[in-house]
Amino acid sequence: MKKSFGRRLLKKISKLIPLCLIIASNAALSQEGQKLYPAPLLALDNFFSHHILIAEKSTHLLHLYRNNDGHPELVKSYQVVTGKKSGDKGTEGDFKTPEGIYNFTNFLTNKQLIEKSGSQGVIYGAGAFVTDYPNPVDQRMGKTGSGIWLHSTNDEARLDKGLDSKGCVVTANNDLLDVSKYIELNKTPIVIVQDLVYLNDRTHEAQKNEIKKNIEGWLAAWKNKDIESYMSHYSPAEFKDIKGNFVHYKAYKKAVFSNPGTPKIDLDNMSILQSKNYAIVTFMQRYQSSTINDAGKKILYLRQDDSYNWKIISEVFTKNGLEGSDKIAFEPSMRFFKDSTFKENSESKKGNN
């Protein structure tokens, strides 16, 4: 009996150690007068990145950050499990969790999961946030698979295993309910990394400004209808969109630029995130010309070429994620579980997603 109690106590203490180390590390940095920022979070804003999640596979932690005047501030961390196999996801069914930057596009309630998967739906716990894996960068790299979610579980003993999912990020039911308060679909990104790297203030600012300067040059060329300068910001080898490849897109933009008048283009609410081999710039775009008057969310996916110059490989324009643009500030709430009758059943069978 005493041994059993001791094991349970040790297990509880071990869960607290990673978070204690984070708090201690942050305190030490504050005392030394240094500023360190998570490398993936270069620039935040109050609309598209008021809160951001970083899942760190090596520590089995999900970190919640909030925007603090353009810089990330750690709010709290949650214990998670990821794919049964280590490494970056590459193919369908490899049991690996992808590494990159993703948006939540949908939320499935416990009831919907059971309707969708039958009795197996209970293994997803309270609910599931669906990501947009594979994103355009994943597709360029030939990655396959789908159904990468942030969800909870009906068997929280799994959380002690660290590597125990088919590729999803899995957390406790209460933690999913808590973190859901800070999530907005198509607005709250999740960055998945193997190891979370931190940058000092100077390096963080330099990397942010490098990408920001690139976007400013792209915008200036667009406003001036300078087709060669504009297309120099795109990757001839990798760029694709609904108009086709680089050559097709250039022909399309050349025709657009030939229209009379000068377009009025404004970018607001810009956020800049980076992964190990690409960056994502998200902003509100307003475009007005003699023939078009439109506004929406634009996402630019960029990769560095052989000369380390950032080039656009994909751009996505959508109306999704504009909801609430008239609000002054984001307010955390139980929006996804407002009408939920979900109650954790401690006697439920073990799941293994």
Kindly give the residue locations of the regions a language model identified:
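Surface-exposed, charged secondary-structure patches
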Residues: 96-97, 122, 251-299
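Short beta-strand edge/turn micro-motifs at domain boundaries
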Residues: 295-353
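Short, solvent-exposed aromatic-acidic interface loops
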Residues: 79-86, 150-155, 286-287, 314-326
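Short, aromatic-enriched amphipathic alpha-helices that serve as compact interaction elements
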Residues: 207-226, 233
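Exported/periplasmic cell-wall-interacting domains
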Residues: 95, 110-216
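Short, solvent-exposed secondary-structure junction/capping segments
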Residues: 231-244
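Gly/Pro-biased beta-strand-loop elements
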Residues: 36-149, 328
